[in-house]
Amino acid sequence: MSNYPKRIYVLPARHVAAPQPQRMAPKRALPTEQVVAQLLGDDMGPSGPRKRERLNHLSQEEKMDRRKLKNRVAAQNARDKKKERSAKIEDVMRDLVEENRRLRAENERLRRQNKNLMNQQNESVMYMEENNENLMNSNDACIYQNVVYEEEVVGEVAPVVVVGGEDRRAFESAAFINEPQQWEQARSTSINNNISNQLRRMDSKKNNTISVDMYLTIISILCNHMDRNKKMDTSNKSSNISRAQAESSIDSLLATLRKEQTVMQRLVQADPCTHLQKRVKHFRRIP
């Protein structure tokens, strides 16, 4: 144990830079002879020096006959190799022509596909632009359809409703018109029908304990309806009245309505049923 050091120091490892990737040199094109040899299957490996036999035991004539035989065999082998090579070349040429035809057909197909895709892309862009224009036009049309053009009527006053003894009045805008609107006539007929139905129900039930607010509401609606018809007639006859005169007429109308309302409230509190029936008969007699 005494051989071991008493202290052990742990030091940080040195910073080792990452090895830079080596740039690969571009591959050189193979020479034509090597390409042809690969296609034909020739052996391009290195060949050693040819060893010659010692012919010391043969005579000169035997050497000549042997040489002639070897030349004849070599010529025949060369002819056979030439035929075999020519056959291989024909096969390779046939395969290359077929591959060239296939590549040309594939290239033409890819050209047509690329052209179709470009046309579809242009058509999609044009279609999107047309859709955006149509959408904008439809939005504009919807906006203009939602716009409502209203004509203001001179002296048109909202009905006065009494709830719990407090007045809640709403005043509508006033303007000049030349002739009465159809919806005003329909509204007047509907109001008369509603009032007659309410009175029939009241007569059938014979209920004398009806709230004062209901009487005052009905009276206010009737007064407003009659005054509106009068104002419509006067506005048709004199369409050139100024706005100041119209405002003064509205103020006077409001004052008369308030006075009439107070009077009606007193009368209704005294005897509700009889006074309301007289008032309704009076309005029915008026054309």
UniProtKB/Swiss-Prot annotation:
Region (Basic motif): 63-88
InterPro entries: bZIP, bZIP_sf, ER_Stress-Reg_TF
Biased composition (Basic and acidic residues): 78-87
Region of interest (Leucine-zipper), ranges: 89-117
Domain bZIP positions: 61-117
Top-level taxon in the UniProt lineage: Eukaryota
UniProt keywords, alphabetically: DNA-binding, Nucleus, Transcription, Transcription regulation, Ubl conjugation
Matching SUPFAM superfamilies: Leucine zipper domain (SSF57959)
Gene Ontology CC, one term: nucleus
Recorded GO MF terms: DNA-binding transcription factor activity, RNA polymerase II-specific; RNA polymerase II transcription regulatory region sequence-specific DNA binding
Cell compartments where the protein resides: Nucleus
Gene3D superfamilies: 1.20.5.170
The protein's name: X-box-binding protein 1
Organism of origin: Caenorhabditis elegans
